[in-house]
Amino acid sequence: MLTDRFQSYVERHGLFSRDDRILLTVSGGVDSMVLLSLMASLGYRFGVAHCNFQLRGAESDEDEVIVAREAARYGVPCYNRRFDTAAEMERTGESMEMAARRLRYAWFDALSREHGYT
C-alpha cells in the first residue's frame, strides 16, 4: 500500500519524525495533493502553504481554492499567499522562475519561523 511505502521511506531516510511540525508546500498538482493525503492519513503534524503566483489566470485561483478546501477537509492549517510575480519580474529583471523561487522561499522561511515548522 502507498501509505506503508511512504512511511517506510520517511523512516528509512530520517526525513522527519512524528514530533516535527512540517510545513508542506502544496501546489494543487497531483503529486502534492497525494503527499497532502499521505501526510494526513499517517497522522503527521503539518500545515499547508500554497503560493498563487497569478500567472495562469483562473487556473491559479482554482488551485488556491482546491488546496484550501483539502487542507480544511483534513483539519490542518492552510496559509495562502498571492504574489504579483509579473510586477516582481519587472521590478528586478529576474526570470519568472527566479522571481517565483525567491518569493516563495522567503515566505516559506517566514512562515516556518512564525509558526514553528521545521
Residue ranges of each PLM-predicted region?
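Core alpha/beta nucleotide-donor-binding catalytic domains of modification enzymes
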Residues: 1-118
